[in-house]
Amino acid sequence: RIITLGLELGILQPGRIALAAPTGKAAVRLQEQIKDAFEQSPRSNSPNADDRPKAMTLHRLLGASADGSRFRHHADKLLPFDFLLIDEASMIDLLMMARLFAACGPETRVVLLGDPDQLTSVEAGSVLPDLCGGESASGKLAECRVHLNISRRAAEGTGILELAEHINTGQPQAALDWIQDPKNPHLHQVKGANVAP
C-alpha cells in the first residue's frame, strides 16, 4: 500500500520505483501482492498494469553478470530509481546489502521488509537483525523501524504463530507446553544419519 499511496499523492513517480527480493520465488510473491494492492486501490489515477513497478531478484536489479562476479549498477553507475522496496530482507547477506546500498543515490528511499527472526542469509552477515537492533535499538535507524504485529500470511488460530511468539520472547516452558498440547499440530522428531546435528 505504501507504493499505491505514494503514487496517488504524487510522492512517487511511475518508472522510478523498483521492487526486489533475494530469490525468484520471493519476487513472484511480491509481484502478486503489488498486483493485488493496485487492483484494490480506490483511486482512478493508479497506473495501468504496464506502468506498474515489476518485482525482480536483487541480482537482476543490480545487473549481475552470468557468473555473479560483476554488476552493472554500483557506486559509479547508480540505479535509476527514487524508491526501492526490498522484500524478505532478512535473507540478504552482508556483501549483497553493501552492493545494493552502494548502487543507491543519496536521495533514494529504501524500504526493507522482512522478519529479523526468520530466514537468515545463507552467506555471511545477519544484516536485517543487526539493523533492527532489537528492542533496545536507538538512533536514526530505530526511528525508521516499524514492527507489524499482525501476520498477513499465517491465519490467526493456526497455532504456529503462538509457538513462534513463545520462542521469540524467550518462553521455553510455554513453547514446550504448546508442543505437548494434543490440540496443536503434531510435530515429528527427525532422526537419522542425513540430519545435521
Model-derived regions, located:
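Conserved RecA-like ASCE P-loop NTPase motor core of nucleic-acid helicases/translocases
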Residues: 1-33, 113, 185-197
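Loop/turn-to-beta-strand initiation segments
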Residues: 16, 80-84, 107-111
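Inter-Walker segment of RecA-like/P-loop motor cores
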Residues: 17-80
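Catalytic acidic motif of RecA-like/P-loop NTPases
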Residues: 59, 90-91, 98, 117-118
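Walker B catalytic acidic pair
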Residues: 87-88, 114
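Short, conserved "post-DEAD/DEAH" coupling segment immediately C-terminal to helicase motif II
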Residues: 94-108
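Conserved helicase motor core of P-loop NTPases
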Residues: 117-197
